[in-house]
Amino acid sequence: MSQVDINHARALVYQLLSSLFAREVDEQRLKELTSEAAQQFWEQLSLEANFTQSVDKIRSTLNGIKDDEALLELAADYCGLFLVGTKHSASPYASLYLSGEDEPLLFGEQHQQMSEFLHQSKLQVQSHFPEPADHLAVMLAYMAHLFCHSENSVQLSFLQTCFNSWLAKFINHLTQCNKNGFYSAVATLTLAWVKQDIAQLEPAVAIIS
């Protein structure tokens, strides 16, 4: 497999993770995530020890949804965690975990920084997703873009500065709020994936720096 193929494969994982944070799982998405091809993907991903526990939780939750009521319960989890904005939620915005302010504002410094990254790449947050640019789903989608369109050093810098600096705090808060455990598993898998990419990119960047 060429490096281009590897980068595209990794980009697909970031796109998947982005989609899970961008919107709730509906009936069509559930079919995609539990299809034969998806089962093979989850099985392959679970072979990596750092991913196994998270992937097993994601798979068991998705495969266990057998009726509309169970699907609605998962959708309610998404809404309660990411859309409501109460003490029982875990808003997926970098600014809430990086700002030193007691009550950080949305559309603040991290949003502006992420908007500039998007602008430099001639991208923008789509109108059907009216969220600040430092929403985790946006950042993951941008990371997928970088894996297909940028050098290793750019990928590494973005992972280190824009993900590694706050994801652990987000996961700690999310775990306290997410009783079902599905989205905690998705977030934990995201951090493990980011850390693996950083570990793989650092030696490659060091060789040419």
Curated annotation (Swiss-Prot):
Functionally, this protein is described as follows: Involved in the biogenesis of TorA. Acts on TorA before the insertion of the molybdenum cofactor and, as a result, probably favors a conformation of the apoenzyme that is competent for acquiring the cofactor.
* Record protein name field: Chaperone protein TorD
Has UniProt tagged this entry with the keyword Electron transport? Answer: no
| Segments forming a coiled coil | none
Which species is this UniProt entry from?
Answer: Shewanella massilia
Q: Which GO terms describe its biological process?
A: protein complex oligomerization; protein folding
The subcellular location is: Cytoplasm
Query: Which cellular component terms (GO) are annotated to the entry?
Result: cytoplasm
Keyword annotations for this protein, in alphabetical order, are:
Chaperone, Cytoplasm
Instruction: Say which family it is in.
Output: Belongs to the TorD/DmsD family. TorD subfamily.
The record's listing under InterPro entries reads: Chaperone_TorD, DMSO/NO3_reduct_chaperone, HscB_C_sf, TorD-like_sf, TorD/DmsD_chaperones
